[in-house]
A protein has these predicted regions:
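Single conserved hydrophobic/aromatic residue that forms the stacking wall/gate
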Residues: 1-9, 13, 260-264
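Metabolite-binding pocket within alpha/beta catalytic cores that recognizes anionic/polar moieties
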Residues: 10, 14-166
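Generic non-transmembrane alpha-helical segments
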Residues: 23, 27, 173, 177-187
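Residue-level detector of anion-binding/catalytic polar loops
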Residues: 84, 116-117, 188, 217, ...
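Active-site/ligand-binding-proximal alpha/beta "capping" segment
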Residues: 184-217
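A C-terminal functional module that forms or caps the active site or interfaces directly
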Residues: 205-247
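His/Asp/Glu-rich mid-to-C-terminal helical/loop segments that flank catalytic regions of hydrolases
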Residues: 248-263
Length: 264
């Protein structure tokens, strides 16, 4: 009985995802191939999308809504360069009280919209002492210290396998393209491992030391669930952190106030 209930719940999740995607597909003239998830203070990138369509999260059936300052709460679909894209201007966080299937809900909607590549951004605290506030970091891998995983429970076979491979969670080909673009544009780009904590408290100095010992270069409260679900769904993913501050214990400074300003 318990298994039957879990299976029914997963079917309901699948149906809710499809309803959200169908709502957009019926109205949009685009079939986006690239998804963008824009983190704290980074949503202004969506303003560069041309001939854009806007879908407020509150208007999309079954979509959660963001409660975080600096997150607009809408999908922007249009053209960026010569590519059709869909951008999340504002993401959902585990610490807001959402289950991880809701945090990652938009990624699966993107999959049904036709997205095959995903670019994820976030604001993060630097753990690596050779980094500086304001640096950009290309994510090479992640460590999940959130205490949970969005794939817990019955697998939704329509999206991916029960045990997805995470050996290249951040696609090497896409990472190399980002490195090439940064070099051409003369943008300093660090590389490192992103460590997710659940939040909403910032990490303690002891937790930051632990993250550093375990091989982390930056810490934050997002990204990992979306990347896991994207990989499960067969979406190639690349991630970039804007290092808005040095993590706790590295410098003696307050943490949240400069995030949006530095990101912009």
């Amino acid at each position: 009985l318990h298994k039957a209930i879990r299976r029914q719940r997963q079917m309901c999740i699948r149906d809710r995802i499809k309803a959200s995607a169908d709502f957009i597909l019926k109205q949009s003239k685009y079939k986006p191939e690239i998804g963008l998830i824009l983190g704290s203070g980074l949503g202004s990138l969506a303003d560069a999308i041309e001939d854009a369509e806007y879908y407020n999260y509150a208007d999309i059936p079954n979509f959660p809504t963001s409660t975080v300052e600096g997150h607009a709460g809408r999908l922007v679909i249009g053209k960026l360069g010569n590519k059709q894209v869909v951008a999340m201007q504002g993401r959902f966080h585990y610490y807001e009280g959402y289950s991880l299937d809701k945090v990652t809900f938009p990624v699966r909607v993107m999959k049904l919209l036709g997205v095959s590549k995903l670019i994820v951004t976030n604001a993060a605290g630097a753990v690596n002492e050779s980094f500086n506030a304001g640096d950009l970091m290309l994510i090479t891998d992640h460590i999940n210290f959130s205490g949970s995983n969005p794939l817990f429970g019955h697998n939704i076979d329509e999206f991916g396998p029960r045990f997805p491979d995470m050996s290249e969670a951040y696609n090497l080909e896409l990472r190399n393209k980002v490195l090439e673009a940064a070099k051409e544009l003369e943008i300093k780009l660090q590389q490192g491992v992103y460590v997710m904590f659940s939040g909403p408290t910032y990490e303690t100095p002891a937790e930051v030391r632990f993250a550093r010992i375990m091989g982390g270069d930056a810490v934050g409260m997002s990204t990992v669930p979306e990347v896991i679900v994207a990989n499960h769904s067969g979406i190639k993913t690349v991630g970039i952190s804007c290092l808005t501050n040095m993590a706790a214990g590295i410098l003696n400074q307050p943490l949240h106030l400069p995030l949006i300003h530095i990101s912009e």
